[in-house]
Every structure is written in C-alpha cells, then in structure tokens.
Amino acid sequence: MITRKSVFQLFMAFSLACGGLGAVSVLNAPEAAAANTCGTSYRMVKDGRVPVKDASGERFATIEVSFSSKDNQNCAILVKEGRHWGLEENVNVSIAFSGDQDRQHGQDTDSGRMKEYSRAVYTAKGVAAGDKPIKVSATVGNASASAEGWDGSGNAPRITNPK
C-alpha cells in the first residue's frame, strides 16, 4: 500500500541521490536556488513574504519577490513550506513588472504542479534601464507580494545592469 510517508521517503531518497540537495537545504538557500534560473549574479534587493492559507488555515506558502542583475530578469519565487500542502497541489502564479514609460513592460503567468517541500521559480523579463524604480510582483490566489528596485548606484536598493 502506498502511503504519504512512503511517497515522501521515496522523494527524499531521490532528492539526495540527485546531487545531495535535500528539501531543507533548498528552502534554506533561496539565493542558490534562484541562481539556477536568474543567473549567478543574482542579488536580493528586497523581498515581500505573504503567507497563503486555505480555508482550514493549514496550508501556506511564501512568496519571495526579488531581483536579478543578469539578463534583465526580475524573479518571483514561490516557496511551498510545510507538510500540510500534501503531495501535489495546483499552483497558479501571476507575475508582473512595471516601471517608467520607456521601459519594456510585461507579464508572465504560469501554473504547475509542485511537490511537497519544493519551490517554483518564475521569471519575467524587462529592460532594466531607467531612472525610476522597477516593480515586480507575484500573486497567488488573494495574496500577493512585491518589491521595487533601481538601476545604477546610490543609497536606495538597486539592481545592477549585467556586464
């Protein structure tokens, strides 16, 4: 008989066999996990974290909205935490970014099935030049998180153009 415990044990064994990255190590290293999608020059500027719970209040996720300096990508990371998610869930994520008028705007909407203790990284590309902040936001259901950043140098949180 296949149980939740046996499936979880199989999943953990597979995770360890494929590079030794257990679920806990991934959740504790958002920069490293995001770097695979957002590039090695990934740098956290600011993040917004919003718990997402169902009617029972048992399930939750964390939305981490952050910036990448590589390929002008702004990244929104949805992290699923806790065993209450069950083995599989449908997750709908909407990402949008905006800035000044001469900046390229765009939106990327995606959905997928996520395993327990896993994360999904969604990206939206835009031109990272300009003197006004660029904002990236992620929405999951009725919960959302966002962050703003600037290019160039200065005291405010900024993202750096890729070299």
Regions found by a protein language model. Give the residues of each.
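N-terminal prepro-regions of secreted/extracellular proteins
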Residues: 1-55
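Post-signal peptide N-terminal regions of Sec-secreted extracellular proteins
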Residues: 33-163
